[in-house]
UniProtKB/Swiss-Prot annotation:
Heterohexadecamer of 8 large chains and 8 small chains. This is Ribulose bisphosphate carboxylase large chain. Its EC number is 4.1.1.39. It catalyses: 2 (2R)-3-phosphoglycerate + 2 H(+) = D-ribulose 1,5-bisphosphate + CO2 + H2O; D-ribulose 1,5-bisphosphate + O2 = 2-phosphoglycolate + (2R)-3-phosphoglycerate + 2 H(+). The gene is cbbL. The record marks K338 as: Transition state stabilizer. The basic functional RuBisCO is composed of a large chain homodimer in a 'head-to-tail' conformation. In form I RuBisCO this homodimer is arranged in a barrel-like tetramer with the small subunits forming a tetrameric 'cap' on each end of the 'barrel'. GO terms for molecular function: magnesium ion binding; monooxygenase activity; ribulose-bisphosphate carboxylase activity.
Length: 489
């Protein structure tokens, strides 16, 4: 800030550009304890990109539309967010078909945030700036969370390592399925679906995001029938099984009641939806750790703000916040399924959830090094439009610490639900065996599956039914620094 705009002169200025108010500082060097946010800014016509960045910094920290005398009662120089870097996004602006967009780096002093509160963090970072007139569009692309701030959060209630130990499942991916149809079944028929899937070889069955307590099936009935199915399948197979009982409800009191009932029935896992809100998610995470329960999060609603490339919020930020909040599972994309998912972007999401230290990688959309300060890892969930014929691709893209959920790919099997589960389990174990033998399971994948199908009729039926079905639409959210490979998956 120039000297002439400090002191009394500053407060006679009325309305000043945000840059001159101190929210732009190209010489600023972020501290290790700063929270850093990276925004994609599309300025309004005639607005300088540095001024737009300064406006976002100001309105997400201490500024209002005019200078105020009460600044002088605070450590205002410290508490102002500093936009310190703004650069043109590749393939935008002059000479391209896209209007100019800019990556703006903004640093926030740690004292601006309440410890252990996602709600407070988000109230500043995304609370007011997205409707600001100086920007035509705004997207939060990434954040660097300092270790000092991470240490104020619980992190995942259970974590991948303890979950595998608790469930006694090692050396392979976990398998699951969402009960279908997700609405309309009676409690008893719902339980029958759960039993058939688990008996056939799945590790988990799951409620879908919008099954709560409706006239056709009260939540208590669903819990009772599902846990009866879990116990019978566990006894029949000798394996630990589970069902994600969705405890999402209209109030925290109701959610706690449902979670306590799930625990009393012997469930190892409960489920919530992203739409319940950040504070409710953190509250359920604390309950889950206290009660030794795995917490599964369905990302219901995320695409309303994460899918568009120029406005909203990248899903990698949600991954970071949810790891801090304390969930154990989160749906994070499949690459080959029916939902949005560029391969490089999905890799960035999975790395964010599973790394102890995430290295900066612009190709996968990770703009910062991130030390996770010993917070537990989150198990990603791949769900939506996947089937046994894609098993080699899923293993290649997603790694081993992931739950592969085949809903329609289990329950839509022509020989029935249990056969669908058998097909998925055999396909997975055939691929794991090939991997362990050192074979190129990606290149040989189709042949490995065909060989296994010679002695497994359910797998043969699955391969014949779904063949090479994929959903190869180009993603809307793609990497900025390398070409998208979505269409060639």
């Amino acid at each position: 800030m120039s000297e002439e705009l400090k002191g009394e002169a500053r407060y006679k200025s009325g309305v000043m550009p945000y840059k001159k108010m101190g929210y732009w500082d190209s010489d600023y060097v972020p501290k290790d304890t700063d929270v850093i946010a990276l925004f994609r800014i599309t300025p309004q016509e005639g607005v300088d990109h540095e001024e737009a960045a300064a406006a976002v910094a100001g309105e997400s920290s201490t500024a209002t539309w005019t200078v105020v005398w009460t600044d002088r009662l605070t450590a205002c120089e410290l508490y102002r967010a500093k936009a310190y870097r703004s650069e043109l996004v590749p393939n935008t602006g002059p000479g391209t078909k896209n209007e100019a967009q800019y990556f703006a780096y903004i640093a926030y002093d740690l004292d601006l945030f309440e410890g252990g509160s996602i709600a407070n963090l988000t109230a500043s970072i995304i609370g007011n700036v997205f409707g600001f007139k100086a920007v035509k569009a705004l997207r939060l692309e990434d954040m660097r969370i300092p270790v000092a701030y991470l240490k104020t959060f619980q992190g995942p209630a259970t974590g991948i390592v303890v979950e595998r130990e608790r469930l006694d499942k090692f050396g392979r991916h976990x398998l699951g399925a969402t009960t279908k149809p997700k609405l309309g079944l009676s409690g008893r028929n719902y339980g029958r679906v759960v039993y058939e899937g688990l008996k056939g070889g799945l590790d988990f069955m799951k409620d879908d995001e919008n099954i709560n307590s409706q006239p056709f099936m009260h939540w208590r009935d669903r819990f009772l029938y599902c846990m009866e199915a879990v116990n019978k399948a566990s006894a029949a197979t000798g394996e630990v099984k589970g069902h994600y009982l969705n405890v999402t409800a209209g109030t925290m009191e109701e959610m706690y009641e449902r979670a306590e009932f799930a625990k009393s029935l012997g469930s190892v896992v409960v489920m919530i939806d992203l739409v319940i809100g950040y504070t409710a998610i953190q509250s359920m995470a604390k309950w889950s750790r206290k009660n030794d329960m795995i917490l599964h999060l369905h990302r219901a609603g995320n695409s309303t703000y994460s899918r568009q490339k120029n406005h909203g919020m990248n899903f990698r930020v949600i991954c970071k916040w949810m790891r801090m909040a304390g969930v154990d599972h989160i749906h994070a994309g499949t690459v080959v399924g029916k939902l949005e998912g560029d391969p490089l972007m999905i890799k960035g999401f999975y790395d964010t959830l599973r790394d102890t230290h995430s290295a900066k990688n612009l190709e996968t959309g990770l703009f910062f090094d991130q030390d996770w300060a010993s917070l537990n890892k989150v198990m990603p969930v791949a769900s939506g439009g996947i089937h046994a014929g894609q098993m080699h691709q899923l293993l290649d893209y997603l790694g081993e610490d992931v739950i592969l959920q085949f809903g329609g790919g289990t329950i839509g099997h022509p020989m029935g639900i249990q056969a669908g589960a058998v097909a998925n389990r055999v396909a997975l174990e055939a691929m794991i065996l090939a991997r362990n033998e050192g074979r190129d399971y990606v290149k040989e994948g189709p042949q490995i599956l065909q060989t296994a199908a010679k002695w497994c009729t359910p797998l043969k039926q699955a391969l014949d039914t779904w063949k090479d079905i994929t959903f190869n639409y180009e993603s809307t959210d793609t990497a900025d620094f390398v070409p998208s490979t979505t269409a060639s998956v």
